[in-house]
Amino acid sequence: MSTTFAARLNRLFDTVYPPGRGPHTSAEVIAALKAEGITMSAPYLSQLRSGNRTNPSGATMAALANFFRIKAAYFTDDEYYEKLDKELQWLCTMRDDGVRRIAQRAHGLPSAAQQKVLDRIDELRRAEGIDA
């Protein structure tokens, strides 16, 4: 596995949450699992998140995946993880108000105009010393 279970789980906590609020807390996840009839202790979830426990059961992975509305394969299948992680990165990017405003303004422009916007952004990134 290219990344640890803890890193993958924390990525979900950091990025998968409803609009208009911040990330879920461990207590919220435990309460939601309990409402589904699944028992998970706060110390156990903390150990999973810190990397002190590294081999959760399939049932635990399925319960956490269900909470975050993803497939449990996220935790075990590197190819699926990489695919979903790209989507999570996009989600993080689009949460930035400035990026969202640029995307909204570029929407509907002809392809040639969109390319000009991209070219200008690349110029600005180079000027700022950011990889384009």
UniProtKB/Swiss-Prot annotation:
This is Nucleoid-associated protein EspR. It is found in: Cytoplasm, Nucleoid. Disruption phenotype: Mutants exhibit growth defect during infection of mice. They establish a stable infection by three weeks, but the bacterial burden is an order of magnitude less than the wild-type. Induction: Negatively autoregulated. Transcriptionally regulated by the MprB/MprA and PhoP/PhoR two-component systems. Expression is growth phase-dependent, peaking in the stationary phase. Probably induced upon phagocytosis. It comes from Mycobacterium tuberculosis (strain ATCC 25618 / H37Rv). Residues 38-50 bind DNA. One of its GO terms (molecular function) is DNA binding. GO terms for cellular component: cytosol; extracellular region; nucleoid; peptidoglycan-based cell wall; plasma membrane. Changing R100A: Affects protein stability. Decreases affinity for DNA. Does not affect dimerization. InterPro entries: Cro/C1-type_HTH (IPR001387), Lambda_DNA-bd_dom_sf (IPR010982). Homodimer. Binds DNA as a dimer of dimers. Virulence regulator that has both architectural and regulatory roles. Impacts cell wall functions and pathogenesis through regulation of multiple genes, including the espACD operon, which is a key ESX-1 component. Influences target gene expression positively or negatively, depending on its binding position relative to the genes it controls. Acts by binding directly to the DNA. May play a central role in regulating virulence gene expression. The N-terminal domain binds DNA and the C-terminal domain is involved in dimerization. Both domains are required for transcriptional activity and for ESX-1 function. Its main location: cytoplasm. Changing D122A: Moderate impact on protein stability. Does not affect DNA binding. Keywords: Activator, Cytoplasm, DNA-binding, Repressor, Transcription, Transcription regulation, Virulence. Changing D131A: Moderate impact on protein stability. Does not affect DNA binding. One of its GO terms (biological process) is regulation of protein secretion.
